[in-house]
Regions:
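Catalytic-face loop-and-helix region of soluble metabolic enzyme cores
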Residues: 336-396
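Anionic group-transfer/hydrolysis microenvironments
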Residues: 99, 139-141, 321, 379-381, ...
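Glycine-rich, charged/polar anion/phosphate-binding loops
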Residues: 80-82, 302-305, 332, 361-363
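Active-site-facing alpha/beta catalytic cores
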Residues: 92, 102-103, 107-352
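Long, contiguous, compositionally biased segments that the model treats as domain-scale units
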Residues: 14, 22-170
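Single conserved hydrophobic/aromatic residue that forms the stacking wall/gate
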Residues: 1-12, 397-402
Length: 402
């Protein structure tokens, strides 16, 4: 079952102790508050793409503070998403994930959040009608403040500074102070993620996501002459809506939608500090988001990022590139979903249209032969970009995965 992940392709990046996979983590900069509730032992594993914080005591204070704060999401919500991801793995639902390549503190405004949410809801309405299938709506939002970098440092005019690793780590300005990793930024990221989730809940529970309202947005979209070709499709949805209303469908029941958050579990200290025990079941949940994924650079089956996620009950994803071997995929299933529970593991392909037909089939066959269920998600943005205004990467929707 192929589902869809959309994110913009802005060239925003992140840093770590060193680029690439497999470099052991510098334990001297990690905090010592490693409670026994975390059985996974990720600190003893190689951990790439981590910031080098200059003050270990300050890092320890920040993570202790984070551990004392309320969860951003709740176990019941996570379980609901897991059930919907299980339906998608069986072909009974379609997953739509959208949001920024990397969020910024500057754009953490009500208007930016509303517009991203609106776009995802509009797309979900069209997909639901076109496929006659429920759509699982996930925002790459409320926590996507970090992203891996290919180089640990950046040099300009003979000056070398740490790379910009996202707003939860350092600042984009090219000065020594701005580029020095600051653990207090994780607290800022936590607070901004909380306000984003609060606003999303208000929108999706308060009538803003009403199906009739979402359809009216799509009608406005087709008023643009550039999109006239979609007008007939909008008319079909319009007729279906009128039929539902005439047939007595309770539209009040369609005023609310389930909307979930996701981000890359990149900053190990932050994710570890956000793990909580569910009082109902005793299970561990990473309460920074409903769904977490590990990236192409950090997905080593025995490495720290995968090890951390083995210990939590959230649905998790793994980015899969064109150079991934079938044995790599099976090893990841062994680590992240050894008992084969539907809804637990998603494989997110990031291959580009040019390499997809060659690289993906062997991986699909390996998963099929293994027999344990996964939810397939395709990222049509990666590898299909063009350079738009101001050197920003963008993607034409008609050039995505075939």
């Amino acid at each position: 079952i192929y589902t869809l992940s959309l994110h913009d392709a802005l060239p925003i990046s992140i840093v770590g102790a060193g680029p690439g996979r497999g470099r052991p983590y510098d334990a001297s900069v990690m905090n010592e508050l490693d409670p026994p509730r975390i059985p996974a032992g990720w600190r003893a594993r190689p951990a790439s793409q981590q910031p080098v914080y200059p003050d270990a005591a300050e890092l320890a204070a920040v993570t202790a503070d984070l551990r004392s704060r309320p969860p951003l999401v709740f176990a019941g919500e996570v379980d609901s998403l897991r059930a919907q991801m299980a339906a998608a793995s069986r072909g009974r639902a379609f997953v739509l994930m959208g949001g920024d390549c990397a969020e910024t503190f500057r754009e953490n405004t009500a208007n930016h959040i509303r517009l991203k949410l609106q776009t995802i809801l509009q797309m979900a309405a069209v997909l639901t009608y076109g496929a006659s299938t429920p759509v699982v709506k996930i925002g790459r939002m409320a926590g996507q403040y970090a992203k891996p970098r290919s180089r640990a440092d950046e040099t300009r005019d003979g000056v070398t500074l740490p790379s910009y690793r996202g707003d939860s780590v350092n600042d984009h300005a090219f000065t020594p102070r701005a580029r020095t990793p600051d653990p207090r930024r994780m607290l800022d990221a936590y607070l901004r993620a909380g306000t984003t989730l609060n606003l999303i809940r208000s929108f999706t529970m308060g009538g803003y996501a009403d199906l009739r309202e979402v359809h009216s947005w799509n009608r406005g979209f087709t008023a643009n002459p550039a999109y006239k070709r979609f007008e007939a499709f909008a008319e079909e949805i319009d007729r279906a809506m009128r039929f539902m209303e005439a047939a007595g469908v309770d539209f009040d029941a369609l005023r609310q939608v389930d909307f979930y958050s996701a981000h890359e579990a990149l900053l190990l200290e932050y994710e570890d500090a956000m793990i909580r025990v569910d009082s109902r079941s005793g299970r561990l949940y990473d309460t920074s988001a409903h769904l977490l994924w590990v990236g192409e650079r950090t997905r080593g089956p025995q490495d720290a990022h995968v090890t951390l996620l083995t210990g939590v009950h959230n649905p998790v994803g793994v980015k899969i590139g064109p150079d991934t071997a079938p044995d790599d995929v099976v090893a990841l299933i062994d680590r992240l979903n050894p008992t084969g529970e539907a809804g637990r593991l998603s494989l997110i392909t990031r291959m580009g249209a040019d390499r997809l037909r060659e690289a993906l089939p062997p991986l699909v066959e390996a998963v099929r032969a293994d027999g344990r269920p996964v939810t397939w998600i395709t990222d049509p943005m990666h590898g299909n970009t063009i350079t738009a205004d101001k050197d920003r990467k963008s993607t034409r929707l008609n050039s995505s995965h075939p």
